[in-house]
Amino acid sequence: MKRILLSAVLMSFAVAASAQNYYVDAQNPDMLRFGDYREPVRKEIVLPCQVGGYNVYKSDLHTHTIYSDGSVTPQFRIKEAWLEGLDVVAVTEHIEYRPFEKEFGEYVHANLKKDRDLNEAVRLSQKEGAYWDIFIIPGTEITRDGTTVGHFNALFTKDNNKVYDEDPVQAIRNAKAQGALVMHNHPGWWRTSIDFTEAEKVAYAEGLIDGVEVMNYNEFYPGIIDRVQERGLFIAANTDIHASSAEDFNKYEYMRPMTLILATERTEAGLRDALEAGRTLAYGFNTLCGNEALLVDFFKASVNVKKLSDKAYMLTNETEVPYLIQFGDSNPVHLSPFSTIRLEGTPEFKVLNMFCGKNTHPVVKLSF
């Protein structure tokens, strides 16, 4: 009897709790609305707000939509970026490869000029970006055979219709003539190494390349870190996204790679200045890559240090970046996101999930 009574009480609580998930619609009393409905909510990526006196902007410098070979609209792509915590998105549709135009229908082909306006995706993205407060970098991707030539993103283009040339290097020159910055994309894709193709040799020799992707989608090229350091280029990590991020990343619990831009302001002038100065970090796979000084500054901006005694101290990680630190040749120590660890000894260590070279890690020296 007691069990039956208890079950009835629990059931009544469950019904009451369930009922609280609904509310009567303000205009239609015959309609109940599910109470847990929410407006779109942005997932904030918790990183240092400033590093070395510069603001940290989370960006994706390589994206695609149905205006080339992506499977979503520009509007969807920009809203998606806002929901996932980004601040800056580059619109980089392929110039040469736009298969989805065939799917736009007979009406479109009959009523629009044959020569497509290759700036349309940028305009649509800028309009959507204004709504969601996402800064849009106009751009395009110069796309040729990945094994024998390579792919390059032109950023801050003025007119994408004037970039194409049959000669891929001349196409890069055309973009540079507009004031664009050129990023070498996924330098090992479809290849057996990251060695230069003949076209890439010419582009690099002429100083046409401003940055290189060290991470693209699920690819990581540690050797590129040395290249950007030696040549004074900016380093990047991007999605090269074609489908939705839910399909490409969230479903598999992959981290969306991003380029962290350290700039004075989120304007064209501010972002360009940062890229030209190489003030970027590549962030993906719980790994950070870039210049050693920038990495050290980023770590120090992420972690609060509390002195306990002459030998003991605590480190509190105030970001969502996990850190793996190593004192000398000892076993690594995990400093998980939003956690504190107690340590003793000399406050000098390597951060193993930070790379300032193919096989090198930054050394952090703390003072307190």
Predicted regions and their residues:
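Sec-dependent N-terminal signal peptides
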Residues: 4-13
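Charged catalytic cores and adjacent phosphate/nucleic-acid-binding surfaces used
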Residues: 20-59, 78, 149-157, 192-368
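Short glycine-enriched loops at secondary-structure junctions
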Residues: 140-144, 188-191, 241-242
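Sec/Tat signal peptide C-region and signal peptidase I cleavage site
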Residues: 15-19
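A metal-dependent hydrolase metal-coordination microenvironment
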Residues: 23, 32-181, 185, 207, ...
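His/acidic metal-ligating clusters that form di-metal
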Residues: 181, 187, 196-198
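Alpha-helical transmembrane segments and their juxtamembrane interfaces
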Residues: 12-13, 72, 103, 250
